[in-house]
Amino acid sequence: MPELPEVETTKTSLAPLLGQKVTNVQVFQPKLRWSIPDNLADLVDYTLDSVERRAKYLILNFIPLADDGISSTVQPRNLQPRQLLVHLGMSGSLQQHNHASDKRKHDHLIMSFIGADSTQTQLHYYDPRRFGSILWLEEYGDKLLNHLGPEPLSDAFTADYLYHLIQRSRQSIQTQNSKSIKKQPIKRAIKSVIMEQQAVVGVGNIYATESLYLSGIHPATPANEVSYAQIVILVAHIKTILQKAIKLGGSTLRDFTVADGQTGYFQQTLNVYGRQGNACPHCESTLENIKLNGRASVYCPLCQPIISM
């Protein structure tokens, strides 16, 4: 699944399309995780103004052309800016072609652009497993974005934030008489917590696995048993790992590419993810694998011991 570094890299790779006008929108398979809106062709004659990322979502901001053909948010025709919310799902990617390109089997949408110099470009949404989504932000933004936690590379994601979240903010538990409610520390596995989008966004399996390894924390350690000092180290490694992954273009484990067709290289630096049965890079112990919430979690039994309080 494309995770935060892959989505961030995709955002950056869309820069050549900024300022270009949409000339055509073709939807070949609308049935993704949620159906593609049937009025996406309304974007024809709009200009792609900017691209943002929130968690693993891309937000494509389009502005309409004024009557004089100049992009503007002030429209005599009462046209308003539009925003697309794009999620790449398990296997999706946005791929840019600088010429008319034949539709491939898993191309579900092709958006055509023209630049000020008459250069024509196509943007293909490619998704073999069809778990992604392309939606209007104004219709689905509240539902999909409002519950999200802080960005891991922002100042809001700190050791203090994560530690207090774990210690004080477990789901409320009702007593048998349903009258009183008490809160307890989070006892779920620390890996599960840092992968929850409500806690912090975008820390997927690859980057959670690598961060926990570098922090010396067993992935199954109950979150409330992780010390504050360990949380400080973990948060620092999450930030460092994600920054490094973005710099290397993310991870290409199957067929992920960004819009310009480039693949990521972070997978070449992996210490433990996907390496069960191999030697630990640090101590040469055999790396082991457990399942947490249905996901593989590779770790070193010597470098990442379970410590019971």
Curated annotation (Swiss-Prot):
GO MF terms held by the record: 8-oxo-7,8-dihydroguanine DNA N-glycosylase activity; class I DNA-(apurinic or apyrimidinic site) endonuclease activity; damaged DNA binding; zinc ion binding
Catalysed reaction, written as an equation: Hydrolysis of DNA containing ring-opened 7-methylguanine residues, releasing 2,6-diamino-4-hydroxy-5-(N-methyl)formamidopyrimidine; 2'-deoxyribonucleotide-(2'-deoxyribose 5'-phosphate)-2'-deoxyribonucleotide-DNA = a 3'-end 2'-deoxyribonucleotide-(2,3-dehydro-2,3-deoxyribose 5'-phosphate)-DNA + a 5'-end 5'-phospho-2'-deoxyribonucleoside-DNA + H(+)
InterPro entries: DNA_glyclase/AP_lyase_DNA-bd (IPR015886), Formamido-pyr_DNA_Glyclase (IPR020629), FPG_cat (IPR012319), MutM-like_N-ter (IPR035937), Ribosomal_uS13-like_H2TH (IPR010979), Znf_DNA_glyclase/AP_lyase (IPR000214), Znf_FPG/IleRS (IPR010663)
EC number from the UniProt entry: 3.2.2.23, 4.2.99.18
Cytoplasm keyword on record: no
Cofactor: how bound: Binds 1 zinc ion per subunit.
Origin superkingdom: Bacteria
Keyword Lyase: yes
Positions annotated to bind DNA: H106, R129
Main function: Involved in base excision repair of DNA damaged by oxidation or by mutagenic agents. Acts as a DNA glycosylase that recognizes and removes damaged bases. Has a preference for oxidized purines, such as 7,8-dihydro-8-oxoguanine (8-oxoG). Has AP (apurinic/apyrimidinic) lyase activity and introduces nicks in the DNA strand. Cleaves the DNA backbone by beta-delta elimination to generate a single-strand break at the site of the removed base with both 3'- and 5'-phosphates.
Protein's recorded name: Formamidopyrimidine-DNA glycosylase
Gene designation per UniProt: mutM
